[in-house]
């Protein structure tokens, strides 16, 4: 009978997030092993390489972030959905600082084409549900949308909030950042009215 695994994938990814917070993007598998209190062999039993560990950490962090963003995009009132999606960006980064830092590890397009082979497909499609939810919000917010409306919605609910919160990642994200992100989102998207 095989011995049960001492560490789950999530235990290892939690260790990777802790190692990243302590050692930065050059964290090693030895740093991850130290964070979980186990041998490096336990990690290599589950993951083929350091690159895969940190790619999987990025994917998990993005997935957790997307869960709240999908909820915000789906709010019935499209104007409230715009504000809530922007607030979610900073609130998530405040509530889960390790995941926020982990989300800075990779660019989706690069991971999808140059990342470990086993993660490329997942990375290529990680934004599919978010893109579909944003398209739905676009139609609710602008009944006859143009490409310019889509640009405004993307800028207001994704790019601007990311830019507002990014300087705070790795430290304390002040509560006022939520309101700043929401106000900027409403103003940017409102340019399409």
Which sequence ranges carry the predicted segments?
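Hydrophobic alpha-helical connector segments
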Residues: 56, 70-98, 157
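N-terminal intrinsically disordered/low-complexity leader segments
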Residues: 1-7, 18, 112, 193
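Amphipathic alpha-helical packing segments from all-alpha helical-bundle domains
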Residues: 66, 70, 112-143, 148-155
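Helix-turn-helix
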Residues: 11, 15, 22-52, 56
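Alpha-helical DNA-contacting segments of helix-turn-helix folds
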Residues: 54-61, 69, 103
């Amino acid at each position: 009978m095989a011995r049960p695994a001492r560490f789950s994938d999530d235990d290892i990814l939690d260790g990777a997030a802790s190692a990243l917070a302590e050692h930065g993007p050059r964290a090693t598998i030895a740093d991850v092993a130290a964070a979980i209190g186990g041998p490096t062999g336990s990690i290599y039993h589950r993951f083929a390489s350091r690159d895969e560990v940190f790619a999987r950490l990025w994917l998990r962090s993005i997935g957790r972030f997307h869960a709240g963003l999908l909820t915000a995009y789906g709010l019935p009132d499209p104007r409230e959905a715009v504000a809530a999606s922007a607030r979610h960006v900073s609130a998530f980064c405040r509530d889960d600082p390790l995941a926020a830092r982990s989300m800075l590890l990779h660019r989706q397009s690069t991971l999808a084409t140059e990342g470990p082979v086993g993660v490329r497909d997942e990375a290529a499609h990680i934004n599919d549900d978010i893109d579909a939810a944003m398209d739905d919000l676009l139609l609710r917010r602008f009944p006859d949308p143009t490409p310019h409306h889509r640009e405004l919605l993307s800028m207001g609910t994704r790019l601007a909030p990311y830019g507002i919160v990014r300087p705070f990642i790795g430290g304390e994200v002040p509560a006022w950042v939520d309101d700043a992100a929401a106000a900027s989102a409403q103003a940017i998207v409102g340019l399409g009215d």
